[in-house]
Amino acid sequence: MKVRASVKKICANCRLIRRKRKILVICVNPKHKQRQG
């Protein structure tokens, strides 16, 4: 899980999701997991 100021989709499988005021990226590739904060 990477914590970043700017969260972006890295590949076509990445999905942007909002959970409890946090923006997450969930993907098939575990390296693409990100959250903002």
Swiss-Prot record:
First-listed, main subcellular location of the protein, grouped into a coarse class: plastid
Pfam families: Ribosomal_L36
Annotated protein name in UniProt: Large ribosomal subunit protein bL36c
Matches recorded under HAMAP family: Ribosomal_bL36
UniProt keyword annotations, A-Z: Chloroplast, Plastid, Ribonucleoprotein, Ribosomal protein
PROSITE patterns attached to this UniProt entry: RIBOSOMAL_L36 (PS00828)
Subcellular location: Plastid, Chloroplast
Gene Ontology biological process: translation
Top-level taxonomy: Eukaryota, Viridiplantae, Chlorophyta, core chlorophytes, Chlorophyceae
GO cellular component terms attached to this protein's record: chloroplast; ribonucleoprotein complex; ribosome
Gene Ontology MF annotations: structural constituent of ribosome
Family per similarity comment: Belongs to the bacterial ribosomal protein bL36 family.
InterPro entries in alphabetical order: Ribosomal_bL36 (IPR000473), Ribosomal_bL36_sp (IPR035977)
